[in-house]
Amino acid sequence: MKTIIVFLSLLVLATKFGDANEGVNQEQMKEVIQNEFREDFLNEMAAMSLLQQLEAIESTLLEKEADRNSRQKRCLGENVPCGDFPCCGKLVCQKTFGYGWLYKSPYCVKPSNG
């Protein structure tokens, strides 16, 4: 009988202190969950900030690439029939003796020095 009383008293004490620890555990779990949500929120905010920075860098690079890809109008090289299109660089659109008599159109040639 004495052993049953001892075990019952231990059961009551364990239940009482177990409930107290459970309340503490619940508070600790709430704190842990809140900290995790804060960390997740901060990580998400950092990721969003990083994403915005990357988008800004990407837009500047795309602008530079668009500027680089925009080129002058196409031009014609040396000994190519010209007319509607301009000749490149220092070439001039002239009727020449060599090709002009055959095709009856001017050609892009280097300007003569004289």
UniProtKB/Swiss-Prot annotation:
Whether tRNA processing counts among this entry's keywords is no
Q: What tissues is it present in?
A: Expressed by the venom gland.
**Function field:** Ion channel inhibitor.
What's one GO-annotated cellular component?
A: extracellular region
For this protein, the record's InterPro entries field holds:
Toxin_22
What is the official name of this protein in its record? U17-barytoxin-Tl1a
Keywords from the UniProt entry: Cleavage on pair of basic residues, Disulfide bond, Ion channel impairing toxin, Knottin, Secreted, Signal, Toxin
Instruction: Mark which residues the record calls propeptide.
Output: 21-74
Which cysteines bridge via disulfide bonds?
75-88, 82-93, 87-108
Localization, per the record, is: Secreted
Give the family this protein belongs to, as stated in its UniProt record.
Belongs to the neurotoxin 14 (magi-1) family. 03 (ICK-30-40) subfamily.
Q: Give the domain section of the comments.
A: The presence of a 'disulfide through disulfide knot' structurally defines this protein as a knottin.
Q: Does the keyword Secreted apply?
A: yes
The signal peptide stretch is 1-20
Pfam families hit by this protein: Toxin_22
Q: Which GO molecular-function terms appear in the entry?
A: sodium channel inhibitor activity; toxin activity
